[in-house]
Amino acid sequence: QDSCQASTFSVIIVRGSVASWRVRPDMPEQRAAMTIQELRAIAVPVIVRTTEDMLSLVPDTLREAARDHDVILTSGGVSVGEADFTRDVMARLGDVLFWKLAMKPGRPFAFGRIGGHDGAWLFGLPGNPVATMIAFYQFARPALLRLAGVDPVAPPPLLDARSSGAIRKAPGRTEFLRGVLFEADGHWQVRSTGAQGSGILSSMADANCFIVLGPDQTSVTAGEPVAVQLFDGLV
């Protein structure tokens, strides 16, 4: 399977192989491409182009990508801002199968096809870097594995650990906090990596797991058990 990636950010990219492209290290397209590179055994990643947030440029970029590839990954352009055109263009050129997720971070996420029933699958990832990574790991990665013939695709296992501190959460959505799993007093414990903003890459760089809080879950007190998804085998 071939996959390609486009970005709606105004960042300079050298076209060519993954090894030859350049991009600012704090931008989400770099992180998404690194995760695609981890799947090189099943997909050939191609950086198509960086598209500025201009409506006139997005349709041609997606048409070009869909013509020669099976899967398209985009970063940004799927929220509700004035420059978020990707979802509308998807609807014009194909089908939007779903949009918006009850999760944090990663709520702006579009999935569909460009070019009808036999067209390329499109994963419209969020624009903020941490949200891009979480959406890729939770949705795009297992889908790419399935498209490559892996069946079944086992979901990442969830482990139980005690939260070392209090975590504030409102019900209604699944939240993925970046955390550090460690052993203390004969038990597995987990702590958050600190500030959890979707643009704070250090929250991922310092983590070894996700703390997964389900949609019905509310705030967590210190010592309370929580579900943990390890980065090992995922990231």
Spans of model-derived segments:
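Phosphate-interaction motifs
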Residues: 1, 13
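Nucleic-acid processing machinery
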Residues: 25
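Helix-rich terminal scaffold detector
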Residues: 32-125, 129-134
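Flexible glycine/proline-rich
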Residues: 91-235
